[in-house]
């Protein structure tokens, strides 16, 4: 393949030389235009293909470069060789200044900023007549050679830029750009500051456009504002997209399409643009990754390398620590009036595993974000060893010795596995082969045995976790924070993960683990800190935490004052779930779930965080499609129906987190609940207000201004107005004060007595068991126990929440 590439390069070079020196002048001009267009494309390929940012202002930078050369040669008396580098430096400086406000925004907002910049350049070039010649432009721009020679010079610059892009993309800075584009939060967690990285990409793209503009001015000998229309910036973007963003030859191929295709279609007269546009659409449809990407897939069948021999001891020596600890004192943060973390203290010592647990909404991930620099605490102190890292941004925290992983694994999907880990090696410059050897050793340490040159986007879920941990270890951290690393892993992989974490602790790293798998937590933790409603309620070794009544109350709800109801005889089956499996992409969550609900029955679904309760509710309501299994509802199959059709069938979800329409009033929210019905009567709203009297005084208030309890009552009332066959309630007590939760469950008890069919998922076992007829307990994505609600609070329930891993119940 390399021989073919070399032969093609030689042939193209020979053809370019022959065209510029021997062919008619117009063909030399076309080739020069191709080269300058490709040169702009190479720069934009750095910005879009590597850094993932869109600019529609490249025409403005092209104009600045062209006017710079024209003014310096025609008015300042400089020759071309003096004017060209000065013009490029000028464009780079202007782009660096522009990047200060422009790169505070990303995506479409950056595109709009650069569009405005292009219009400013056009306006200045028209109005500043004394310098730019106004609308008439500037003529007599000297060229270093004739048309053919100048075109050949442009081709030379283009060739150097294309080769330079190939090497730049694999450099540390190029990989950092790709990492920032792929997963900016993960990039910050390994010490990469996205702002300067994007700034460099922006300046490089602008400088390349300025260089192309200077060459274009010399090639044409004349420039005017009309030479740089806004449509040209769009064409430059098409050059990269059609050619293949991120591909070395993408800009060259895209430029050939944009420059030569209109010439080929010249005979079509007024239909030329129509056919040209249709052709571009067809190309984008057939090759969404660009022409270069399609060619690469057709011509290359790359065999992934097998695992290289690796020295695990080298990795252990790299991460070995003699000390270092994490100290968190009095950390507090509030969002609006809600205190998410309230004066929490945590100490994680070197060589020990400290786990942070708690029910949903306890503040665990918020605490981790405060410690790792992704959020700023209102008060408190965070220290790594003797270094205070309070309120430092995430990339500085990473450089101070604290690494982290994420709740959903975030490898850099567009990079190879090996490059993911290489980017984690922050402490010291890259060291060539020695750095590659160390990266391989880290992969071996965590247990990754797949190909090192596999794109991370193609990895299985467990391998994505392992690569993320290896990347975090690359910085040889003093403290490693792990946010639910066992989520989605099977029992075997979870046990291997536990052994790995214990090995890392023995190497001297202070590990902080946030995890819902209580079997893992109880088996490997040296100390456990328990949070509830943002407050620390307990701390100690696993045995004491498991027996602590405050911890049990936090998870199971304590002793409820609501008297349990007697189970009733089941009516006809209304909902029948068989062998249901589901997940999120490669992450399995539910495994062969089976349950049923009879008409008029209230059924509870319990289980610890991460057991799959909310995923089950999303499957039942059509929000996610199950992988396998059946959902029977009144004789109809719902498993493949979209959510709106499931709702029309009568399965109504009150989602987790309330999710009212915040800008609509309470009354408008209620009316929307009945929108699928043709027999809705306004008096039904009065009935709901009688059921939830607190809503009556807030009827014309925006729902977003209600308290949490009022929003939950509104969400339930909205669901009831749909007249559901079954009302699904997902964590209705989440985030509610105890008194408010008790009031809400009192209303659910009344609904049960009225014969409304309810399926309730909730963390507070005591409250929901006091209302339910029957209950299912989920553990590890499977049904761990089921039975009559009044008999369910036994050792099986405790084990599911606090550490035993029961076998599935069929």
List where the protein language model places each region.
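Cytosolic juxtamembrane regulatory segments of multi-pass membrane proteins
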Residues: 308-318
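Generic detector of short, locally flexible boundary/turn motifs and exposed helical patches
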Residues: 4-5, 13, 21, 26, ...
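Glycine-rich phosphate-binding loops of nucleotide-dependent enzymes
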Residues: 322-327, 333-810
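A generic short-segment signal for beta-strand/edge and adjacent turn/coil regions
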Residues: 15-16, 29-30, 79-80, 122, ...
């Amino acid at each position: 393949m390399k021989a073919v590439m070399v032969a093609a390069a030689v042939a193209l070079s020979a053809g370019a030389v022959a065209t510029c020196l021997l062919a008619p002048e117009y063909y030399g001009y076309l080739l020069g235009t191709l080269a300058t267009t490709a040169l702009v494309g190479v720069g934009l390929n750095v910005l879009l293909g590597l850094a993932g940012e869109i600019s529609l202002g490249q025409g403005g930078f092209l104009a600045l470069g062209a006017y710079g050369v024209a003014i310096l040669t025609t008015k300042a008396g400089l020759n071309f060789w003096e004017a060209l580098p000065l013009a490029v430096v000028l464009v780079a400086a202007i782009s660096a200044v522009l990047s200060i406000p422009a790169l505070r925004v990303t995506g479409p907002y950056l595109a709009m900023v650069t569009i405005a910049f292009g219009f400013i350049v056009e306006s200045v070039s028209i109005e500043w007549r004394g310098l730019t010649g106004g609308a008439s432009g500037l003529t007599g721009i000297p060229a270093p050679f004739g048309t053919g020679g100048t075109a050949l010079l442009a081709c030379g610059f283009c060739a150097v830029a294309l080769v330079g892009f190939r090497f730049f993309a694999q450099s540390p800075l190029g990989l950092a750009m790709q990492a920032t584009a792929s997963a900016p939060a993960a990039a910050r967690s390994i010490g990469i500051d996205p702002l300067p990285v994007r700034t460099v990409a922006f300046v490089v793209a602008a400088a390349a456009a300025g260089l192309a503009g200077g060459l274009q001015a010399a090639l044409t000998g004349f420039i005017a504002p009309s030479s740089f229309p806004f449509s040209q910036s769009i064409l430059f973007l098409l050059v990269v997209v059609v050619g293949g963003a991120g591909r070395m030859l993408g800009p060259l191929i895209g430029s050939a399409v944009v420059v030569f295709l209109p010439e080929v279609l010249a005979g079509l007269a007024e239909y030329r643009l129509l056919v040209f546009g249709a052709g571009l659409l067809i190309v984008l449809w057939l090759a969404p990754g660009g022409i270069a990407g399609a060619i690469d897939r057709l011509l290359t069948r790359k065999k992934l390398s097998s695992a290289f021999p690796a020295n695990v001891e080298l990795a252990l020596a790299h991460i070995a620590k003699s000390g270092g600890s994490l100290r968190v004192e009095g950390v507090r943060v509030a969002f609006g009036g809600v205190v998410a973390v309230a004066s929490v203290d945590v100490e994680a010592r070197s060589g020990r595993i400290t786990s942070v647990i708690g029910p949903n909404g306890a503040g665990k991930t918020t605490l981790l974000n405060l410690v790792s620099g992704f959020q700023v605490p209102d008060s408190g102190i965070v220290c790594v060893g003797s270094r205070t890292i309070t309120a430092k941004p995430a990339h500085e925290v990473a450089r101070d010795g604290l690494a982290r992983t994420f709740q959903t694994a975030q490898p850099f999907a567009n990079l190879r596995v090996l490059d993911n880990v290489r980017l984690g090696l922050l402490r010291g410059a890259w060291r060539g082969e020695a750095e590659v050897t160390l990266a391989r050793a880290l992969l071996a340490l965590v247990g990754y045995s797949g190909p090192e040159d596999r794109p991370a986007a193609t990895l299985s879920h467990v391998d994505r976790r392992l690569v993320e941990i290896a990347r975090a270890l690359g910085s040889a951290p003093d403290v490693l924070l792990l946010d639910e690393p066992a989520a989605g892993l099977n029992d075997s992989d979870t046990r291997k993960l536990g052994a790995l974490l214990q090995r890392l602790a023995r190497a001297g790293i202070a590990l902080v683990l946030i995890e819902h798998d209580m079997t893992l937590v109880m088996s490997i933790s040296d100390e456990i800190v328990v949070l509830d409603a943002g407050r620390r309620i307990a701390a100690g070794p696993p045995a004491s935490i498991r027996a602590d009544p405050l911890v049990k109350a936090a998870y199971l709800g304590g002793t409820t004052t609501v008297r349990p109801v007697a189970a009733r005889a089941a009516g006809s089956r209304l909902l029948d779930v068989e062998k249901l499996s589901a997940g999120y992409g490669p992450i399995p969550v539910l495994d062969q779930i089976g349950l049923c609900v009879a008409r008029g029955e209230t059924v509870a679904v319990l289980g610890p965080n991460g057991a799959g309760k909310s995923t089950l509710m999303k499957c039942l309501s059509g929000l996610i499609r199950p992988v396998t299994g059946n959902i029977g509802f009144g004789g109809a199959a719902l498993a493949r129906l979209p959510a709106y059709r499931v709702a029309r069938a009568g399965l109504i979800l009150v989602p987790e987190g309330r999710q009212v329409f915040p800008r609509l009033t309470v009354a408008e929210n209620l009316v929307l609940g009945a929108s699928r019905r043709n027999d809705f009567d306004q008096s039904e709203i009065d009935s709901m207000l009688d059921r939830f009297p607190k809503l009556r005084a807030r009827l014309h208030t925006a729902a977003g201004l209600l308290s949490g309890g009022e929003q939950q009552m509104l969400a339930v009332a909205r669901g009831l107005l749909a007249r559901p066959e079954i009302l699904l309630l997902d964590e209705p007590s989440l985030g509610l004060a105890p008194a408010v939760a008790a009031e809400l469950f009192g209303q659910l008890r009344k609904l049960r007595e009225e014969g409304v069919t309810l399926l309730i998922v909730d963390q507070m076992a005591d409250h929901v068991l006091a209302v339910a007829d029957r209950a299912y307990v989920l553990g590890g994505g499977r049904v761990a126990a089921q039975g009559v609600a009044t008999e369910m609070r036994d050792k099986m329930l405790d084990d599911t929440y606090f550490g035993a891993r029961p076998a599935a119940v069929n």
